[in-house]
Amino acid sequence: MIRSFLVIIVSAMAVAGCAGPIETRVQSHQLIPAVEQKGFAWSPIDPIANRDTALARDLVDKLLAQKGYQQAPDAAILVHVALADRPADIAIDAGDDKTVRPLVAAKEQKSFQSCKDREHRLTVSLFDQSRGQKLYSGSASEYHCNGTIAQSLPFLVDAALSGLDGETSDVPLSTVRTRQGLE
């Protein structure tokens, strides 16, 4: 009886590393007010080399439509989507030899975690071509051990575009959202 109870406890602890709260780290920045005509075109440099990138663009397209934006070939707004999937246990620095600064810190593995985390990151940028300025930039990222980037994308798109058409600001707004799901 006691042995069975211990097996149940150990099994529950092992599985606990797979499901639980997922933090979506969000950074959004409305640099200039949106244009009245909310037509947009896709950046010609966005690669559609795989189905995850194609899915990201499709989800961004749908959410922009819900926010009143319409795709048009001669639109003033240019939309760029960047998608990344990388090992989370490496840090990313930027700069030259004298001014190196950390962009992303390495993530430590949780106790009882049986696999290594990956970071799923989506960045969506809107440029006002008529004014020659960046209109909006939003990024969202999550750590996952077992979840796929395709499973993360609906949440990443919603988070990355959460500040679109908000108040303009000189500094980006950083927030963290928490949801339940497969880590």
Language-model features and meaning:
Residues 19-31, 119-121, 128-137, 141-183:
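C-terminal/domain-edge helix-coil "capping" segments
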Residues 34-38, 71-77, 126-133:
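A short, structured loop/turn motif at beta-sheet edges
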